[in-house]
From Swiss-Prot:
The encoding gene: rpl18-b
Chief location category: cytoplasm
PROSITE patterns reported for this sequence: RIBOSOMAL_L18E (PS01106)
UniProt-recorded name of the protein: Large ribosomal subunit protein eL18B
GO molecular function: RNA binding; structural constituent of ribosome
UniProt organism field: Xenopus laevis (African clawed frog)
Alphabetical GO biological process terms: cytoplasmic translation
Biased composition (Basic residues): 178-188
């Protein structure tokens, strides 16, 4: 008798639609599905893929990072496109004139961008203004900035490891003796 083939790892795991039931997000997906199919632009395909992503894969972009990225050469008068949130940064005082398109912008940011003579667009307005993504700069927030990434990597306690251990407390008796000082076993 032959052995039946395992089919449990056959499928390619990727999102074909957003997990969220948000009707406004799903309307955007409908729109960008159409644009991705009918235009030959990779911009629309990337935006569609990012609309499907989970929240951890759509990290927020701070105002300071947005300004820094838009100050680069050749990016003046272009629209910054963020498939995610833009959050305010109170450390920044003067905001240059920006043209921004994002899923959500905090109220503080919104008022500051408009005050500096900038413009804020939604994705359906962007689809009318730039159906192929012309004169746009696609930006995204730092994915690895989440605290959880500090715990990943080489095991804590091994030589040259900078990985944060999962400990109950940060006291004197926790992760401070064996392997940390020569008098207690060894020192890495």
């Amino acid at each position: 008798m032959g052995i039946d083939i395992r089919h449990n790892k056959d499928r390619k795991v990727r999102r074909k639609e957003p997990k969220s039931q948000d009707i406004y997000l799903r309307l955007l997906v409908k729109l960008y599905r159409f644009l991705a199919r009918r235009t030959n632009s990779s911009f629309n395909r990337v935006v569609l893929k990012r609309l499907f992503m989970s929240r951890t894969n759509r990290p927020p972009l701070s105002m300071s990072r947005l300004i820094r990225k838009m100050k680069l050469q050749g990016r003046e008068n272009k629209t910054a496109v963020v498939v995610g949130y833009i959050t305010d940064d109170v450390r920044i005082h003067d905001i240059p004139k920006l043209k921004v398109c994002a899923l959500k912008i905090t109220s503080g940011d919104r008022s500051r961008i408009l005050k500096s003579g900038g413009q804020i667009m939604t994705f359906d307005q962007l689809a009318l203004a730039a159906p192929k993504g012309q004169n746009t700069v696609l930006l995204s927030g730092p994915r690895k900035a989440r605290e959880v990434y500090r715990h990943f990597g080489k095991a804590p306690g091994t030589p040259h490891s900078r990985t944060k251990p999962y400990v109950l407390s940060k006291g004197r008796k926790f992760e401070r003796a064996r392997g940390r000082r020569a008098s207690r076993g060894y020192k890495n």
